[in-house]
Design a protein with these regions (language model features):
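Class I S-adenosyl-L-methionine
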Residues: 1-42, 47-144, 242-243
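A contiguous loop/helix-start segment that scaffolds small-molecule binding in enzyme catalytic cores
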Residues: 2-14, 18-19, 29-32, 95, ...
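Class I SAM-dependent methyltransferase SAM-binding "motif I" and its flanking Rossmann-like core
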Residues: 3, 22, 41, 117-190, ...
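Surface-exposed loop/turn and secondary-structure junction residues enriched for glycine/proline
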Residues: 42, 47-48, 56, 67, ...
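Generic secondary-structure boundary signal with a strong preference for alpha-helix termini
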Residues: 48-52, 128, 134, 155, ...
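Hydrophobic packing residues within well-ordered alpha-helices of enzyme cores
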Residues: 69-70, 131, 150, 206, ...
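Active-site catalytic pocket residues across diverse enzymes, especially alpha/beta-hydrolases
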Residues: 73, 154, 210, 214
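Short hydrophobic/aromatic-enriched beta-strand-loop microsegments
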Residues: 77-84, 135-139, 158-165, 214-223
Length: 291
């Protein structure tokens, strides 16, 4: 029987999620290694992550793991795409866990490959908890999370003695009622950097809520798209103007929202030759929105 996987970057040997592997059982009970793939640039894989990929025989990987990282997987290793995009999953999370447990119980040694760090908004904790409850051995290999990669790549330090003594990561994922359930009073405190994952779809609501809960409308803010990749973009503005800039520039996930005084360092610390994209005034935002 032949299999075809239409996932981005999938090799010819890949199998679609839901199809069982044909390799023989290698032990009575297998093992799972949860590997963080980092923010996208394969040069940012840890040595331990790279070694796990080079010795892998079976890899379950998500949507945010790009072709350059997949190229680091050992030739001949089976790949199963279990991609998860916003509101569109190849497999529901529960079925991903079931598949992982079934493969391990059949004796397979599985690499579970996730973008960024599996324990930071990657649902890795849920997956490892399920493995522990099923009595399956596991290891966790941390990865550079997207916020770290983005900050270093675009020149926005996450903390700075003069600007931010607190760092907060939050998820901007929309709930079923299309609201963002965050602790806005916590996020609106001064002298901190807030990085919001999965928040592009809720960007106007996020900015307006931060302003409503006390942050000045002219607080520096940025959205970083495709961090660390050749297609990376960083748009800087203020809480008041960032939504219009993001619409004008057609920002798409994966992207991070970064809020705080550290954002103002981007023009100074960005790599030489970086084209700065910004909207700092209400007039600029209005012009962008009507463009």
């Amino acid at each position: 029987m032949s299999f075809q996987n239409n996932a981005p970057g999938a090799a010819a040997a890949d199998q679609p999620a839901g199809e069982g592997p044909t390799a023989p059982v290698v032990s009575a009970v297998g093992h799972v290694t949860l590997v963080g793939a980092g923010p996208g640039d394969p040069e940012l894989l840890t040595r331990k992550a790279y070694r796990a990929l080079q010795t892998a025989t079976l890899v379950l990987y998500d949507h945010l793991v790009g072709p350059a990282v997949l190229d680091c997987i050992a030739p001949g290793a089976e790949r199963i795409y279990v991609g998860k995009e916003s509101s569109r999953h190849t497999l529901p999370q529960e079925q991903i866990i079931e598949l992982m447990v079934r493969l391990a119980r059949s004796g397979r040694n599985v690499v579970r490959l996730k973008g960024g760090d599996g324990y930071i908004f990657g649902r890795g904790g849920e997956e490892v908890q399920a493995l522990a409850e099923a009595g399956i051995g596991f290891d966790v290999v941390p990865g550079i999370t997207a916020a770290q990669g983005a900050g270093a790549s675009v020149g926005i330090p996450l903390t700075h003695r003069d600007h931010a003594c607190t760092l907060v990561f939050a998820t901007g994922h929309l709930r079923e009622d299309r609201t963002v359930g965050l602790d806005w009073e916590l996020l609106a405190r001064p002298r901190q950097t807030v990085v919001i994952y999965m928040g592009v779809g809720a960007l106007p609501a996020i900015c307006s809520q931060l302003i409503a809960h006390g942050l000045p409308a002219d607080t520096p803010a940025a959205v970083v798209e495709n961090a660390t990749l050749p297609t990376e973009r960083c748009l800087t503005a203020t809480l008041a103007t960032l939504p219009a800039l993001a619409v004008a520039e057609k920002v798409q996930p994966p992207a991070l929202i970064m809020v705080g005084q550290v954002v103002q360092l981007h023009p100074l610390l960005a790599r030489p030759g970086t084209v700065l994209q910004t909207a700092q005034t209400a007039q600029e935002a209005k012009e962008l929105a009507s463009a």
